[in-house]
Amino acid sequence: MPHYTAPQPVVHLAELVLELMGDADLNEVMAMEEASHAHPWTRGNFLDSIAAGHWSYCMRAVDEIPKRIWAYCILLPAVDDLHLLNITVNPSMRRQGVALRLMQAIESIASNMQIPRILLEVRPSNHAAINLYERVGFTHLATRKAYYPLESSSGQREDAMVMVKTLELPPKTYEH
């Protein structure tokens, strides 16, 4: 029987990097936001977050030209919490492990900055997101009543699950 070597994969998950989000990214970010959310953030929301100093990142493939945004996130650092305000994966990149990689990067940021907890809100109807968050160690902390608007114009609202992950931080090192 002949010996066959495995072919190189046609599709592979490239090396991904986080880069600071800037004004030049907003057209692509807005297209992703509007394609992904029933009630998307506005351009003003993103500009305000960047101006306020929220940690705003775009995830891109290192070797891709032109460099598309694969995902983005907006993080609000506080004393002992890193609040994940917005996380979105490019619709064409979903189901490829990008969200997992972004969550791992967010956890690494929190750990490097000695922030022991990551908080987020998620719609209870967003089963895919909840499954991901639970898979990476988030647990249900609380419920915010009537937090999200529903897709209809009825004025009804959906609760938010508040989820949290407490990190095992390395000991602080002090320089003398």
Regions found by a protein language model. Name each.
Residues 2, 119-121, 134, 139-162:
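Conserved catalytic-core motifs of GNAT/GCN5-like acyltransferases
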Residues 2-4, 11-12, 17-94, 100-109, ...:
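Acetyl-CoA-dependent GNAT
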Residues 25, 126, 159:
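Acidic active-site catalytic centers that drive phospho-/nucleotidyl reactions
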Residues 48, 125, 147-148:
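Positions that flank functional sites
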Residues 52-53, 129, 152-153:
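Short Asp/Glu-rich motifs
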Residues 87, 131, 145:
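Short amphipathic alpha-helical segments
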Residues 90-104, 112-113, 117-118, 124-131, ...:
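Conserved glycine-rich acetyl-CoA-binding loop
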